[in-house]
Amino acid sequence: MSGLYDLHTHTTLTDGEMIPIELVRRMSVLGYSIVAITDHADNTNLDFLIESVNRLKTPAELYGVRLLCGVELTHIPPPLIPCTARAAKKNGADIVIVHGESPVEPVASGTNHAACTCSDVDVLAHPGFI
């Protein structure tokens, strides 16, 4: 598939500035062909985010965008990353990102290692402290 890809975006479902369909439409106008919505997630909002984004796949296709449903696990205690990532995939996430250890977002020590050793995690974002 040609065009631009963005596999790490946020919407007003967490700390982004656009509602999900607006993000999809703007990405379409800018020439993106694949976009993943990967709002910050933990056990309290994981199912809600996945269900919400998956509802947009058909409207996104009408704008010429292949929408991937994702989550960015943030502040999950490292021992719980594997089961949380597995739950995300089981419940319909196409991509699982983990927010890494960085000076900007002080997630728990050991998060980077837990993410890198988990087969259900696709991307370690903002690894900062390696």
Region annotations inferred by a language model:
Residues 2, 31-34, 57-58:
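Active-site gating loops and adjacent loop-to-helix segments of metal-dependent hydrolytic enzymes
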Residues 3-5, 36, 123:
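Residue-level marker for buried hydrophobic side chains located in beta-strands
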Residues 4-14, 40, 127:
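Histidine-centered catalytic micro-motifs
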Residues 12-50:
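Metal-associated gating/positioning segment near the N- to mid-region
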Residues 46-130:
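Extended substrate/RNA-proximal surfaces in nucleic-acid metabolism proteins
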